[in-house]
Amino acid sequence: MAIPEGHGAPLIALTSGTPEEARTAVAQNLKAGVNAIKIAATGGVTDAQEIGEAGSPQMSVEQMRAICDEAHQYGVIVGAHAQSPEGVRRSLLAGVDTIEHGSVLDDELIGMFRHNPNALRGYSALVPTLSAGLPLTLLGQDATGITDIQLENSKNVVGGMVSGARQAHEAGLMIGVGTDTGMTFVPQYATWRELELLVAYAGFSPAEALHAVTAVNASILASMPRPVLWKSANPLICLC
């Protein structure tokens, strides 16, 4: 979900301009059978038209609060695309359950993650998605195909994502593993790469990365309504 002409709109997002419209969009999603809602709280790198647009707040706290309130009534979690400290702060204040991507954190934000009375379970988690951001800054434009504006925005955003992941880990916050599948160089099977990046850039030990992708992810998703046909999956394969 996004504001009109916001990040992801209209190609991959229902749009809303008021809290009332936001509630209607949530209801539409729930009727379609979704078990989680993602909102674009800030601008993003891939569709930014100006330097600084990525990470700039887009959706109002009031709209995000309406979305969270409506979704939480049905036990549905809400994740927020947020790529700046202010975007993260506003999202947490509204009651989102996860922050996707993230930014540099301070003591206030760390405290809001740890104790978030507006979130479904009283706390919020960070999902850094390093594998979505790092290729944009580590590889050349001939490989990524991004514009000069997108490159400058990615430099600003990705550094914050990496710093935030490391800070959250040091603070003992709940950190899940996600990849933002569909981004450049992020295929469906790339979860293993995210584990490597958490170890290389965010200070995780290999065991901590495995714990995040299994136990922590399970905790984050624990309240999601299960479909009639539910199959559990674990990314670990043990060879004996």
PLM segments and residue spans:
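His/Asp/Glu-enriched, well-ordered alpha-helical/loop segment
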Residues: 73, 146-148, 158-240
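Active-site mouth loops of central-metabolism enzymes
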Residues: 5-25, 56, 73-82
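Short amphipathic alpha-helices and their capping/turn segments at secondary-structure boundaries
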Residues: 19-35, 105-125, 165-167
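Acidic/polar short surface loop at catalytic or gating sites that assists cofactor/ion binding
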Residues: 1-17, 139-150, 154
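An acidic, carboxylate-rich microenvironment
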Residues: 21-24, 63, 208
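Active-site core of metal-dependent hydrolases
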Residues: 40-159, 176, 181-183, 202-204, ...
